[in-house]
Curated annotation (Swiss-Prot):
Gene name in the database record: TNF
Keywords: Cell membrane, Cytokine, Disulfide bond, Glycoprotein, Lipoprotein, Membrane, Myristate, Phosphoprotein, Secreted, Signal-anchor, Transmembrane, Transmembrane helix
Name of this protein: Tumor necrosis factor
Protein source organism: Callithrix jacchus (White-tufted-ear marmoset)
Extracellular side: 56-232
Swiss-Prot/TrEMBL site (Cleavage) positions: 33-34, 38-39, 48-51, 75-76
Length: 232
């Protein structure tokens, strides 16, 4: 029953009652007016509670059908159930290789799957398609030298169609704004560089991730320096 119907019923009830004069009739009209107000207020409150979900069926009690699951959740759930044949690689830096950035795939949290190869410190693309290419390095030093220091990180491609190295991604950072004064306390600094992008690659393309100052690499913790590709 709607609020308007309730009000009409109360008004009809008022008209049906005999018009009593005097204090008793005034009290009756006051009572009916108060009752009408409380009825309207109660109906309004009930509508608000139902509308905003304060009362009624709770979410935990609703059936768990696909209409309540977001499209993104459905996509993630379905993709996790289907084995992927997309090329995937994630290699990590060798902590024992001093003075160079050497990639390893036979380590914890590293992998080569579905045709990707690690050859001559390069990832070899097994099939044509779109790929997410990414890499991260972490530099660490103590104090700032007199000469201006630049740290570079790049991902390059040598394509089958043209045997020339071309930068896909690159970044430059400088950890020092000015030289550390002689005799002053030298403070440690850290500079991470992350690269990532999507590219159309061909079968047989070779990808390399390189830096200019490997002596400043921080290899103390695993997972700080890595390189990988994911077929899309």
């Amino acid at each position: 029953m709607s609020t308007e119907t309730m009000i009409q019923d109360v008004e009809l009830a008022e008209e049906a009652l005999p018009k009593t004069r005097g204090p008793q009739g005034s009290k009756r009209r006051l009572f009916l007016s108060l009752f009408s107000f409380l009825l309207v207020a109660g109906a309004t409150a009930l509508f608000c509670l139902l509308h905003f979900g304060v009362i009624g069926p709770q979410k935990d009690e609703l059936s768990k059908d696909f209409s309540l699951i977001s499209p993104l959740a459905l996509a993630v759930r379905s993709s996790s159930r289907i084995p992927s044949d997309k090329p995937v690689a994630h290699v990590v830096a060798n902590p024992q290789a001093e003075g160079q950035l050497q990639w390893l795939n036979r380590r914890a949290n590293a992998l080569l799957a579905n045709g990707v190869e690690l050859r001559d410190n390069q990832l070899v693309v097994p099939s044509e398609g779109l790929y997410l290419v990414y890499s991260q390095v972490l530099f660490k030093g103590q104090g700032c030298p007199s000469n201006f220091m630049l740290l570079t990180h790049s991902i390059s491609r040598i394509a089958v169609s043209y045997q020339a190295k071309v930068n896909l991604l690159s970044a430059i950072k400088s950890p020092c704004q000015r030289e550390t004064p002689q005799g002053a306390k030298t403070n440690p600094w850290y500079e991470p560089i992350y690269l990532g992008g999507v590219f159309q690659l061909e079968k047989g393309d070779r990808l390399s991730a390189e830096i200019n100052l490997p002596d400043y690499l921080d290899l103390a913790e695993s997972g700080q320096v890595y390189f990988g590709i994911i077929g899309l």
